[in-house]
C-alpha cells in the first residue's frame, strides 16, 4: 500500500438548532496570558472549531479535515484541525515526505517528519505531524478492520471516568450553580471550571473566583471532584495565595497555573502548593515531557494526541509518565482518539478523561460517530479506524484547500 495524495478538505455546515448551549467566541469571558497587557485584556483567544451565529438565527460551522489517500482506496481521515498553520506545514513540508510511502511504516515516517522540522519541534509544526500520524493510524486500522484501541493492544479499562470541562460556560453565580447541578445529574463525578480572573484583575478577581468555586461546591455536594483551569495565566505567588482559599471547598487540581515554559515554576508549585498541579497540554514530544518529569513538575500530565506528536508519540509519552509513576489524562481535542488511548491503560496510569462540553460538541459536528460520555463514563468506539469519518449529510459545502493559500 502506498500514499497517493495528501489534502485538506474544508467543510461548511449550518446547524439550524444546536441541542444545547454553544461556545460563542464573542461572549465567552476567560482569563488569558495576555491579560497583563491592559490593551489586550478583552481580546480573548478565538476557538475556530465552534459555532458562529448567523443573522437568521442559525449557526455556521467550518472545519478543516486532513485526508490521506492510498492506492488501496483506503483514506485516513482526521479533524477538525484546530489551528490555521498546520495545513500550510502539511502541504509545504510533510506532503513531499509522505507521497509514495507505505502508511504501515509509521515510526519511520514519524522520525523523518520530526528530523525535518528542527526549526519547529514544538507548536503548530508538531501539531501538523500529529494530525498526519493520526491519519496514518486511521489507514492502518481500517486496513486491518479494527478499532484503534485493538491496534494499540486492547482494552485495560472497559470504560473511562469522564470529567466535564466547562470552557465557555457563563461565569455568573446563578449560571454556575445551575450548571453544576445539571452536570452532576448527568452522571459526571468530576467537573473542571475555566476561570475568568487572574493577577491582572487583582484581589477583586480572586474574590470572584473563590465565590464561583464555593457556589459550584454547594451545587454539586461533597462527592464530585472539582478542578480549576487557569489557562497558563497566573503566576507562582497568585497561585499559592488563591490555593489557600480554594482548599476549603476541596478543589482537587489546578491546571496550567503558569506559562508552559516555566517548568521550574511548575515544579515549585507542585512541591509547595496545597492543591496538586497539572499541566503538559502545551508541551510536545517525549523529550519535552521528560524534562517536566525529571523536575517532578506536575501531579497529573495532559498530553494531546492532536498536538504533542500524534497517537504514536502520545503513547510513548504516557508510557514514560507511567515509568515515573505519575498520572496522565489526555487533553481531548479529538475525543474519539482520546477514548481509544485512555482505555489501553490501567486507572493507575490514566484515571480520568476530559470532555469539553461545548467545544467537544462543536468539534464533532461533522463526524459519523461522535464520542460522548454517558452517565459520566466514556466507552471506545468499535468501528474500524480512529472514528473521524465524515457524515456527508451534515456538509453543506466542501472544497479542497489549495496548496498555496
Functional labels for PLM-detected ranges:
Residues 1-15, 24-48, 333-405:
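Flexible C-terminal active-site loop/helix
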Residues 3, 73, 94, 132, ...:
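Conserved, mostly hydrophobic/aromatic
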Residues 45-47, 244, 250, 261-377:
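Shared catalytic-loop signature of beta/alpha-barrel
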Residues 52-54, 69-143:
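Metal- or metallocofactor-binding catalytic centers and their adjacent structured scaffolds
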Residues 54-58, 185, 361:
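Short Gly/Pro-enriched turn/cap motifs at secondary-structure boundaries
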Residues 76-78, 162-164, 189-193, 224-230, ...:
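Hydrophobic faces of well-ordered beta-strands that scaffold small-molecule active sites
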Residues 124-127, 133-169:
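Glycine-rich, aromatic-flanked loop segments that form ligand/cofactor-binding clefts
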Residues 159-267, 272:
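Metal-dependent enolase-superfamily TIM-barrel catalytic cores that perform enediolate-based chemistry
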